[in-house]
Amino acid sequence: MTNFRDARAEDVASIVRLYAEDELGATREVVADSPDEDYMRAFRQIDNNPSHRLVVAEDRGEVVATLQLSFLPHLVLHGGERAQIEAVRVRADRRGSGLGEALFAWAINEARGRGCRLVQLTTNATRPDARRFYERVGFQASHIGMKLTLDAP
């Protein structure tokens, strides 16, 4: 049985492995049995901030999917909070099983329960399968996302 829960420190290595499963993630993540301090520092920052949740789907003791759910206050939408879904990954052998749909239903329900008026996400232009999935679960392509990569300090 799969359950959704907030990630724990001991999940970080499994989460990074999920990030590295696709071509893009494989070029920017460092997979190791013990995650380095940069990953652990980021995990602690997320874990200690009530506006961010790093969530995993766990099945038989294994992390099989993850996403980050962040809550953003805004003046738009009459001061309504919105939820941002990021860093979505489902383990390759679990794709097409309904797990992604269940994870999104859970996340949207969490956002609704918090009073969010909108759930948003972005997806990399190199991930057409992800875009089709997001459209299938009800998201609409409505904006063009842009990013600026900064050099490390």
Describe each PLM feature range:
Residues 54-56, 62-71, 89:
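Conserved beta-strand in the GNAT
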Residues 20-42:
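Conserved GNAT-fold acetyl-CoA-binding loop/helix
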Residues 2, 61-66, 83:
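Glycine-rich phosphate/pyrophosphate-binding loop shared by adenosine-nucleotide-utilizing enzymes
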Residues 44-56, 84, 140:
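A short helix-loop-beta-strand connector motif used in the catalytic cores of GNAT acetyltransferases and
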Residues 87-90, 96-109, 132, 136:
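Conserved acetyl-CoA-binding loop-helix of GNAT-fold acetyltransferases
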Residues 92, 120-130, 147-151:
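Conserved beta-strand-loop-alpha-helix junction that forms the acyl-donor binding cleft
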Residues 3-17:
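A short beta-loop-alpha structural element at the N-terminal edge
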Residues 104, 111-123:
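Conserved GNAT acetyl-CoA-binding A-motif
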